Amino acid sequence: MQDAKTYLSIAPVLATLWFGFLVGSLIEINRFFPNALILPSL
């Protein structure tokens, strides 16, 4: 039971850090390459 409580207290922190890192990288990539997220028209 202690492991479950530890997981439930650590998981939101790890998820927040991961999504913060992901969003930050996407913003920085989009800043340097503004059209990289748009698929080129064929």
Swiss-Prot record:
UniProt cross-references to SUPFAM superfamilies, sorted A to Z: Subunit IX of photosystem I reaction centre, PsaJ (SSF81544)
GO cellular component: photosystem I; plastid membrane; thylakoid membrane
Location(s) in or outside the cell: Plastid membrane
Matching Pfam families: PSI_PsaJ
Membrane topology qualifier: Single-pass membrane protein
Coiled-coil positions: none
TM helices/strands, residue ranges: 7-27
Keyword Transmembrane helix on entry: yes
Top-level taxon in the UniProt lineage: Eukaryota
InterPro entries reported in the protein's UniProt record: PSI_PsaJ, PSI_PsaJ_sf
Gene3D superfamilies documented for this protein: Single helix bin
Keywords tagged on the record: Membrane, Plastid, Transmembrane, Transmembrane helix
HAMAP family for the chain: PSI_PsaJ
Family: Belongs to the PsaJ family.
Role played: May help in the organization of the PsaE and PsaF subunits.
UniProt name for this protein: Photosystem I reaction center subunit IX
Lineage start: Eukaryota, Viridiplantae, Streptophyta, Embryophyta, Marchantiophyta
Gene name tied to this protein: psaJ
